[in-house]
Amino acid sequence: MENLDALVSQALEAVRHTEDVNALEQIRVHYLGKKGELTQVMKTLGDLPAEERPKVGALINVAKEKVQDALNVRKTELEGAALAARLAAERIDVTLPGRGQPSGGLHPVTRTLERIEQCFSRIGYEVAEGPEVEDDYHNFEALNIPGHHPARAMHDTFYFNANMLLRTHTSPVQVRTMESQQPPIRIVCPGRVYRCDSDLTHSPMFHQVEGLLVDEGVSFADLKGTIEEFLRAFFEKQLEVRFRPSFFPFTEPSAEVDIQCVICSGNGCRVCKQTGWLEVMGCGMVHPNVLRMSNIDPEKFQGFAFGMGAERLAMLRYGVNDLRLFFDNDLRFLGQFR
């Protein structure tokens, strides 16, 4: 028993002088582990007479409990001290001013779409929307685009089946509007459109804004004046605008609209390919067949339509030379438009 008391005193002394949790664990293993000092003493009970074993066993258990209790107390003390030290090192000064977070901003394409809508809403146009998954009739047939037209080819259009597709323009919204209401009609139709194309200036998904006006006595002069005023309001410049004859199945006559290069002011540069002009949209008078298929009398009503790519206008307005930058989600690029 003297050896037992000495072991306990030795163990308690070691526990008191330990300053590390890992060292404390080593002490526990040394005295209470499977091969520990006190465990070995317990194994000697078999050498004692049977009548002495209960008494000696009880004393050994009391000794083990003393050491274990001391270990638990010291472990709690060491863990508390370590926590206090860490908290002191990581102390937060609540009197310091908060760290501000940079505010977000609208995407440049969203800004462009909103700007276009605002320009036309000021002159009485309403915003109309429609489905992005369209049927062949509204995307092609109702717009006077026959079955042999190249726009129906698989390399230009994303088809789901023979009748359903991703719209290639927002013109179907114009058709649905003419089917659901009678003139006068003044709408702009912003939205996503899809075509099989991808390079520096084209994307398989892009945003388009188309406009439609149908009323009595509408002429090409009305179309020309509307587009000229819109472009000058959008770019906030007195731009030179020109109309070039073109062809679209859903308008007759049709035209492409060019503006004086906003980069070089018409002097010629890489952006305008030294021509001094930039193509920005297509337009024309609504074809009588389109009006007729929407149950609008072309003898009584006339209309004009126009369409533009939002990314194209955003590139010109903000001086961006690669369309794909709008879709890369690079915060270094997008942060410039806050």
Curated annotation (Swiss-Prot):
Q: Which Gene3D superfamilies is this protein grouped with?
A: Bira Bifunctional Protein, Domain 2 (3.30.930.10)
Q: Which cofactors?
A: Mg(2+)
GO BP terms, alphabetized: phenylalanyl-tRNA aminoacylation
Per the record, the major location class is: cytoplasm
GO MF annotation, one: ATP binding
What Enzyme Commission number(s) appear in the record? 6.1.1.20
Give the disulfide map: none
- Can you state which reaction this protein catalyses? tRNA(Phe) + L-phenylalanine + ATP = L-phenylalanyl-tRNA(Phe) + AMP + diphosphate + H(+)
Lyase keyword on record: no
Establish whether keyword Metal-binding is in the entry.
Answer: yes
Cellular location of this protein? Cytoplasm
Class of enzymatic activity (EC top level): ligase
Q: InterPro entries this protein is in?
A: aa-tRNA-synth_II, aa-tRNA-synth_II/BPL/LPL, Phe-tRNA-synth_IIc_asu, Phe-tRNA_ligase_II_N, Phe_tRNA_ligase_alpha1_bac, Phenylalanyl-tRNA_Synthase, tRNA-bd_arm
Tell me which Pfam families the record gives: Phe_tRNA-synt_N (PF02912), tRNA-synt_2d (PF01409)
Q: Mind telling me which CDD domains this protein's record contains?
A: PheRS_alpha_core (cd00496)
- According to the record, the segments passing through the membrane are none
Q: Which residues bind Mg(2+)?
A: 252
Q: Which keywords does this chain's UniProt record carry? A: Aminoacyl-tRNA synthetase, ATP-binding, Cytoplasm, Ligase, Magnesium, Metal-binding, Nucleotide-binding, Protein biosynthesis
Q: Which domain of life is it from?
A: Bacteria
UniProt GO cellular component terms: cytoplasm
Cofactor binding mode and count: Binds 2 magnesium ions per tetramer.
Identify its protein family: Belongs to the class-II aminoacyl-tRNA synthetase family. Phe-tRNA synthetase alpha subunit type 1 subfamily.
Q: Subunit structure of this entry?
A: Tetramer of two alpha and two beta subunits.
- Protein name per Swiss-Prot or TrEMBL: Phenylalanine--tRNA ligase alpha subunit
